[in-house]
Amino acid sequence: MNITTNGTTILTRSSIIIGVIILVASGLGPLHRSIHRGVEREVECLYRRLHNRILRLNHYVFLIYTVSLTKMVGTLAIAVRGHPGRRGHSDHLTRSIWIKTVRLVILDAIPTYRFCPVAPDLSLPALGASRRLPHFSHLHVHHD
């Protein structure tokens, strides 16, 4: 029985294991930070994409709303005054109603864009110390 060889082997193995644990533990800090940064970057990217889609969707809804409303007003004008091809003055009337409606809808709809959650600065420091997505102060409800 050579106890010294077994003892040395156990000591060597345990020191290697401890060394590996120390190496892993010391590397975990920066690794964790880089993973955290990577996740933050992904969230930021995702948020940007989502935000762009919301804006695009708003544009589409706005266009559909404008077109449908002007069509409705145009149809109403034709029903009241007759078809633009048949009577001279109704053509001018329909066109002016269309223009006025478009102007009205545009002037009415543009201010609603202010209520869209637009974050001007999406860089990581702007996301705040809590590392969460930007919260919109104008949407907060103050409880008494």
UniProtKB/Swiss-Prot annotation:
It is found in: Membrane. The keyword Membrane applies. GO terms for cellular component: membrane. It is a multi-pass membrane protein. The chain crosses the membrane at residues 10-30, 60-80. It comes from the Eukaryota. Keywords: Membrane, Transmembrane, Transmembrane helix. Completely overlaps RSC30. This is Putative uncharacterized membrane protein YHR056W-A.
